Regions:
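Positively charged n-region of N-terminal signal peptides that target proteins for export
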Residues: 1-4
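Short, catalytically relevant binding-site loops at active-site mouths
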Residues: 373, 412-415, 446-447
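Short amphipathic alpha-helical "recognition" segments used for binding
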Residues: 6-7, 51
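Active-site bordering "gate/hinge" segments
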Residues: 18-386, 391-395, 400-403, 416, ...
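Bacterial N-terminal signal peptides
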Residues: 7-17
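A short, polar/charged loop-to-alpha-helix boundary motif
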Residues: 413-426
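Extended C-terminal subregions enriched in glycine
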Residues: 352-357, 426-447
Length: 447
């Protein structure tokens, strides 16, 4: 018999939450974007094609790969304290990211960090007006591609100089892997955002709980409703679309112990919509529980130094897995240009030399699945259908019965892993797209 636990990297606390409210009809849907139309996308694709063939600086390498990511975000946020609104805002914006590679697939500027100039990385971002015309979109695409190209040239020069000085351990490993064009242009409809007025009413009602509780110094209740649409277009012919929808609540309370130590406790839950969140009665109970917990911590005696075993359970067990296991499941090589110690700040997983070795108890197996939306009745918000390089996400069995089967990787290959499994996330400057855990499922056999 197996027990299965799901760890969501984006919001790990969600995975151990009590069962969410019963599923109901999704309500009104968001519909297709009005800001990013097919005409806007066509204009950007034309500019990519033009830049690929015509963008040149005399004596410099031309671009061999250009990728653009359009991101449209709609978000409603509200924060309340002691029954009064302290923040309430609706936001709507569109950004255009350009990624330029110069050289070729064998040796380009990517996965290299220039010391003390980490943001010179062949990437550039500009905001696109909400009511942009195709002409405006094409001009913004030209400007952002030009900026990324100039950075890519600086990056490749520094990378070549570093390699000439012997600053790489694997000069034969390709910089970037080829991918067949992927086309998925159908609109992905998700439930529309909740009304910010409705979220504000809930936040004010729940935040009133902390009125009159003397030991609580500060308290906040925040709700968010978030919609993200993404489009990927590149010079290889990929044209893909994905949409993500998240709603969440967080309750925070602080106090001060008698010895002056600042104390804080919080409660958070996330889902695809507000219908996945606990109801008001449950949130009111959780707020009261936070106040009681804070008082107990405030009055607790100071613990002496302790050396010995520690048992983590519930949310603590999730955080241990999230912080000690999940970051090491990426197979993307550390970026060149820095010492191993410095490069660690940009992330770093297990070496692919460990594939095939035992890394966990034989009772445990680990699978990462960005395409999962639910685990039982619990909403999972850490996934995606398309990764940050426009590659379709894949379910990957990472560990089976304690043995490492593979690692999570994007288009930057390692010594043994040469094909992306759709897990690339842009997690650091330096043009570094790393294979990253998303919805991590851990299954255990009875021992």
């Amino acid at each position: 018999m197996k027990r299965i636990v799901c760890i969501t990297a984006f919001a790990a606390a969600l995975a151990v939450a009590a069962a969410a409210s019963a599923r109901t009809s999704p309500g009104p849907m968001s519909g297709p974007s009005k800001a990013v139309t097919s005409e806007i996308l066509d204009a950007i694709a034309l500019e990519i094609e033009r830049a690929k063939s015509a963008l040149r600086i005399a004596g410099a390498l031309p671009p061999y790969f250009i990728g653009h990511k359009l991101t449209e975000v709609e978000v409603s946020d509200t924060v309340a304290s002691l029954g009064s609104t302290t923040w309430k805002k609706d936001r709507h914006f569109v950004t255009l990211d350009a990624r330029v590679h110069v050289g070729d697939y064998k040796l380009d500027n990517s996965n290299f960090v220039i010391a003390n100039a980490e943001r010179t990385d062949g990437l550039a971002t500009l905001q696109l007006p909400i009511e942009a015309t195709p002409r405006i979109a094409r001009r913004v695409a030209w400007l952002v591609t030009d900026a990324a190209y100039k950075e890519a040239l600086e990056q490749i020069r520094a990378k070549i100089d570093t390699r000439r000085a012997g600053g790489t351990s694997d000069p034969d490993r390709p910089s970037h892997t080829r991918r067949a064009a992927f086309v998925k242009q159908e609109p992905v409809e998700v439930p529309a955002l909740e009304s910010n007025d409705a979220l504000d009413r809930r936040a004010r009602a729940i935040s009133r709980v902390f009125r009159g509780i003397a030991h609580v110094r500060d308290s906040r209740v925040a709700f968010t409703s978030f919609l993200e649409r993404r489009w990927y277009i590149n010079s290889e012919g990929t044209r893909a679309h994905d949409t993500r929808r998240v709603s969440g609540v967080i309750i925070v309370a602080t106090a001060q112990a008698d010895d002056g130590q600042e104390l804080a406790v919080f409660y958070s839950r996330y889902g695809h919509t507000a219908k996945d969140l606990p109801g008001d009665s449950e949130l009111l109970a959780e707020a009261r529980n936070l106040a009681k917990k804070l008082d107990a911590i405030r009055k607790a005696p100071v613990v002496d130094n302790y050396i010995g075993p520690v048992l983590f359970e519930g949310g603590g067990a999730v955080d241990i897995v999230r912080t000690t296991l999940a970051p090491h499941l990426g197979g993307t090589p550390l970026p060149e240009g820095l010492s191993a110690a410095e490069a660690k700040q940009f992330g770093g997983g297990l070496s692919d030399d460990t594939v095939g070795l035992r890394v966990l108890s034989p009772l445990l197996s680990v699978t990462d699945d960005p395409t999962s939306h639910r685990s039982g009745r619990r909403a999972l918000i850490g996934g995606f259908q398309i990764d940050d390089e426009g590659v379709p996400a894949q379910r990957v069995e990472v560990v089976r019965d304690g043995f490492l089967k593979t690692l999570l990787i994007g288009r930057t290959p390692s010594k043994k892993l040469r094909t992306s499994n759709g897990h690339a996330r842009r997690s650091a400057p330096g043009g570094v797209y790393r294979g990253t855990a998303t919805n991590l499922f851990i299954s255990g056999k009875r021992g």
